[in-house]
Amino acid sequence: MSTRARRGKAAARQWTEGVMKDKLVTLIGGGGFLGRYVAQHLLAAGARLRIAQRDPRGAYFLKTQSGLGQTQFVAADVRRPETIARAVAGADAVVNLVGALKGDFAAIQAGGARHVAEASARAGVAALVHVSAIGADAESPSRYGRTKGEGEAAVRAAFPEATIVRPSIMFGREDGFINRFAAMIASPLPVIPVLRATEKFQPVFVGDVAAAIVAAIADPDKAAGRTFELGGPDIVTMGALIRWIARAIGRTPAIIELPDLIGGLISWGGFLPGAPITRDQWLMLQVDNVVAPGAATLGDLGVTPTPLDTVAPGWLVQYRRHGRFTTTTAAA
């Protein structure tokens, strides 16, 4: 990063800290993968946090990252409006980070989004950020994409000035995507099957998504009522990503790209325990997961996207055969 870019980031951080100091922000689902990063950014900016989720004990690890009295924890479930009303009462801003990869998509991603937006509007919250996903579309054939789209519509109806962010696949030390494939490649399996090898992704660093969310809260005049699609600097295919991970951890498995006919058949068995993919996930894979042309992006929120290869090798070392002592081929 250039000296000018570093100075720009430092200035932006100082401005955010001045704006957010002592503001109360409710994070619905704040103990999750993205939530912890949003919490860390807000705590660093001097904000007060209310972490709301079904079991708040799952977010207690954030206690060690905050000052005395800076963070409170409450039980809340997006399917129960009365608990959300209590969670957002008195908040200056609310971030809804709740999503579902299985279970009742409609109740969580559509109904839950509506409950959060309606409660925030009634409570007089100044800023609401709703975390959706690239591919959200009320007409999507997948339940995940369809309910994400329905959730966005519900948020817009209840809280028109809300900011909606749609990340692509997020990566980070605790992610369930890059780590999942790295573990598979590092396993004794002699062959790694790849479904939809030509599908395109635009992986985005979770820390960048968190920074964008905080920027949207801190500057509502710039972000209110807008939808942002958040992707990283590189677009990669599924096949290329798997090969990159293999190089990064110094492994050389046989990587087999399965034809769609076989992938589709496998997805029909997705209801079985341990199945590699569900039917709904297969439907999602039929559409590239990249930022749409002309969409507002990270840059519009003052965030420079972080390349995967600048941060991932630091945690992928755990999957190398001999850890840090393994010699690897450059993962470029």
What is each of the regions a protein language model found here?
Residues 56-115, 119-122, 134-138:
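NAD(P)H-binding glycine-rich loop region in Rossmannoid oxidoreductase-like domains
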Residues 47-57:
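Conserved glycine-rich Rossmann-like NAD(P)H-binding loop of the short-chain dehydrogenase/reductase
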Residues 183-208, 212-216, 220-229:
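A conserved pocket-lining segment of Rossmann-fold NAD(P)-dependent short-chain dehydrogenase/reductase
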Residues 23-47:
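N-terminal Rossmann NAD(P)H-binding glycine-rich loop of SDR-like oxidoreductase domains
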Residues 132, 152-180:
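Conserved beta-loop-beta element that borders a ligand/cofactor-binding pocket
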Residues 15-19, 216-278, 291-332:
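Mid/C-terminal beta-alpha module of Rossmann-like enzyme folds, strongest
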Residues 36, 110, 149:
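Residues forming the Rossmann-fold NAD(P)(H) cofactor-binding site
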Residues 28, 52, 97-98, 128-134, ...:
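SDR active-site strand-loop-helix element
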